[in-house]
């Protein structure tokens, strides 16, 4: 009984983190597309037409369209949007069948284009203990 009291919560945390890794992975294709766009399309301007934030978002220059959370994509929606002079890529969960994740858990990447065209990313997890 004591072993079960210790092992069960640890196992539940493990399975939740394993499921959350799918949320993190869902940002991969959008992140790569934003990086390619930053190298090939976006200028050095910090705002306005031709800027990283204006050119490297959903449905532009090879960045995929936003998706909504549905059964066909493991109940994970991905949104790419401008954020100031940068770009955010956010994956958010919806309540799905057999998922240990709650609705609206999310993984967000905040990208900033450097003068050499490289994109630096910072990450935010909700809940924070998933990162």
Kindly label every feature range from the protein language model.
Residues 1-37:
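Amphipathic alpha-helical segments typified by the pilin-like N-terminal helix
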Residues 38-131:
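Periplasmic/extracellular, small/polar-rich flexible segments of pilin-like filament-forming proteins
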């Amino acid at each position: 009984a004591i072993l079960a009291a210790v092992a069960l919560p640890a196992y539940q945390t493990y399975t939740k983190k394993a499921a959350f890794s799918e949320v993190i992975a869902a940002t991969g294709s959008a992140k790569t597309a934003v990086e390619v766009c930053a190298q090939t399309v976006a200028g050095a301007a910090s705002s306005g037409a031709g800027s990283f934030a204006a050119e490297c978002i959903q449905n532009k220059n090879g960045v995929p369209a936003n998706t909504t959370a549905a059964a066909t994509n493991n109940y994970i929606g991905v949104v790419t949007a401008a954020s100031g002079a940068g770009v955010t890529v956010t994956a958010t969960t919806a309540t799905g069948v057999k998922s240990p994740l709650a609705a609206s858990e999310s993984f967000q990447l905040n990208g900033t284009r450097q003068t050499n065209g490289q994109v630096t990313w910072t990450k935010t997890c909700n809940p924070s203990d998933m990162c």
